[in-house]
UniProtKB/Swiss-Prot annotation:
It comes from Cryptococcus neoformans var. neoformans serotype D (strain JEC21 / ATCC MYA-565) (Filobasidiella neoformans). One of its GO terms (cellular component) is early endosome membrane. Residues 35-68 are annotated as: Disordered. It is found in: Cytoplasm; Membrane. This is Sorting nexin MVP1. Coiled coil: none annotated.
Length: 612
């Protein structure tokens, strides 16, 4: 049944909010994600179709009605907002159809009325937006306060707004997932491949010109780092500064005394500093910026920022950077930036390699790097396709959850109507008593209860599918973290090719030329030759010192590339793939077992459903 669901509006059209701009109908990845084109403006009124759409147009024709309905949506009662916050835990502004059905099921309205309310507000979509959700709550109030709950419509709602009571609902807890996913989604995403704790020996020093870590370069992988990873939580603060500036609340379980607020520009500043300090380290990609972003774009960027900070706090060198520590802990970050000059010198100027570190660099390092460089584009392409296919699967799973909720509503409505359709429910002339009576039919009553049990079964199926959506979202973030690792090393190769170049050969030729000139001046011994020789010798000494510094930088760059390849990339690649897929298989196995339990329980319940 669900293998080939019917086409529905906005059900299967997947677009990556961080990869596509607002152009409608564009193929995946065709447009520049850094484009400043505004996002499409979301609808401010509930989406309705056919009959309900015509009612909406009739309302629009009357200015007072339009103003009243929009007034409810734009300035809803506190209860409406509270219910939305309980169901929309991720802050996307949308609520799943299954969650809305569970909430409306506590209204004590007939199943037929609940189905009609959801039909008026959602039609064929798998989620309800904020305006649609508020409209559904208002329809519940209208149905509860009307003599005939079935006699509801958008037009009647508009006429009744002035004296509309609050809905009587008892929200239940959202379906919980397994303990492995019980932590917040934000904390569970962004797979950390290194222990994020700061070593006790790490110190941070600051003066008028510098602010950097004094911790030496780590050259060995840490044991069992995945047992105690640093968890980073990033949430979008609803309030804005100005008309387009969003702030993010950042919290770490291992640093600081509480959450801190940061703007997107602060992330840009941090990555700019880290790229200048650590050009030969793996740096995670920074998500793009967009003017007038959509809610989907903001949510995708929030998750990308979690992955970025999780990677930085997992990296054995970057996690000890003092600027990163201040970024994650300082409550007055903006004032600190203004009063503290931050050094952006390369780490090679402040860190020296030990003899053991220099000797650990393999002589065939270039061959090892070339081997990865040749295969990196293919790996990156495969991971990109995996992410796209997983997100398409997520859309299909969301549609299945919505369809299960619709199946539950329809079957429960049928269960209520079956006994009423029986001929025995009609009052007639009883030959024996001579008066009209309506008799109960045991067969139809039993069949109706069976239909109700089937509806309850579909409710359970919808809840399990919703849990599956949450699990799949977590594993998609794991896949994106793995993809980001390959993308980050690809960017590292680009920086290495660009920034590892030096002018040692030019300086050597210049020193050799001066040496020859000095020898000729000494042989000629013309007047004033001593001063000219001293001048040339001083210049040669400066160039020789620069050559020594650049040669030491070459060795340091090679050590960095070897460390990133053999320790960071090698360990992260293995751990992310192994643990990510193990968790995925375990979650899928448990979800399948729970679904089988639902069907088995329904099978046992339907044994008592009468046939005749």
């Amino acid at each position: 049944m669900f293998n080939a669901p019917r086409p529905m509006a906005s059900s299967y059209s997947y677009t990556d909010p961080l990869s596509n701009s607002a152009a409608a109908g564009a193929a995946f990845g065709e447009l520049d994600p850094w484009s400043s084109a505004p996002s499409p403006a979301g609808s401010v009124t509930p989406a309705r179709a056919t009959a309900s759409a015509s009612e909406g147009r009739n309302i629009a024709a009357n200015g007072n009605k339009e103003e009243g309905l929009n007034g409810l949506i734009n300035d809803p009662p506190a209860l409406y907002v509270s219910l939305l916050d309980q169901l929309d835990t991720s802050g996307t502004g949308e609520v799943s159809l299954a969650a809305v059905h569970r909430l409306l099921g506590t209204s004590k309205l007939p199943a037929v009325v609940v189905e009609k309310i959801i039909h008026l507000t959602s039609r064929d979509k798998s989620t309800l937006t904020r305006p649609e959700f508020f409209c559904a709550l208002a329809l519940v109030s209208l149905a509860q306060s009307s003599p005939d709950p079935n006699d509801i419509s958008i037009e009647k709602l508009s006429f009744s707004l002035s004296n509309l009571p609050l809905p009587k609902l008892k929200p239940s807890d959202p379906p919980s997932v397994s303990s492995g996913v019980a932590a917040s989604t934000a904390a569970a995403t962004g797979f950390n491949a290194w222990d994020g704790t700061i070593n006790k020996g790490t110190t941070y020093s600051a003066n008028n010109s510098t602010f950097r870590s004094t911790d030496p370069m780590v050259d060995n992988a840490e044991d069992r780092w995945w047992k105690d990873q640093e968890r980073i939580v990033v949430t979008l603060i609803p309030e804005k500064e100005g008309w387009f500036l969003q702030k993010y609340r950042i919290e770490s379980d291992k640093r600081g005394e509480g959450p801190v607020a940061r703007r997107y520009s602060d992330f840009v500043w941090l990555m700019d500093v880290l790229e200048k300090r650590y050009p030969f380290r793996i740096l995670p990609p920074l998500p793009p910026k967009r003017i007038n972003p959509s809610s989907a774009f903001l949510e995708a960027r929030r998750l990308a920022l979690i992955r970025l900070l999780s990677f930085l706090t997992a990296h054995p060198v970057l996690r000890t950077d003092a600027c990163l520590n201040i970024f994650l802990t300082s409550s007055s970050f903006e004032s600190w930036r203004k009063r503290t000059p931050v050094s952006t010198d390369e780490e090679s100027l402040s860190k020296k390699l030990t003899t053991a570190q220099e000797m650990s660099i393999p002589s065939d390092l270039e061959l090892k790097l070339d081997n990865l460089r040749e295969r990196l584009p293919a790996m990156l392409g495969h991971y990109t396709r995996l992410v796209v296919m997983a997100e398409r699967s997520l859309v299909r799973l969301q549609v299945q959850a919505a369809e299960a909720a619709r199946m539950a509503m329809s079957t429960q409505s049928i269960g209520e109507l079956v006994p009423r359709c029986c001929w025995r429910s009609v009052q007639g002339d009883d030959g024996e008593s001579g008066r009209g009576v309506a008799r109960e039919c045991g067969l139809c009553e039993g069949v109706g209860r069976g239909w109700g049990d089937v509806g309850d079964g579909w409710v359970s199926v919808g809840e399990e599918l919703e849990k599956g959506v949450q699990l799949l979202q977590k594993h998609i973030e794991s896949l994106k973290s793995q993809r980001d690792l390959y993308s980050s090393f690809h960017a590292l190769f680009y920086r290495h090719n660009k920034l590892s170049l030096d002018n040692v050969d030019v300086l050597r030729k210049r020193v050799d030329s001066r040496f020859s000139k000095i020898e000729s001046l000494k042989s000629a011994k013309k007047p004033g030759w001593e001063g000219e020789v001293d001048k040339l010798a001083s210049q040669s000494d400066r160039d020789t010192a620069e050559i020594q510094r650049l040669l030491a930088r070459r060795v340091f760059v090679r050590a960095c590339m070897w460390h990133e390849l053999s320790v960071v990339f090698h360990s992260m690649q293995a751990a992310q793939g192994t643990m990510g897929w193990k968790d995925f298989v375990k979650d899928q196995k448990e979800r399948t077992k729970r679904l089988n339990g639902v069907w088995q329980g329904l099978e046992e319940t339907l044994e008592s459903m009468p046939l005749e």
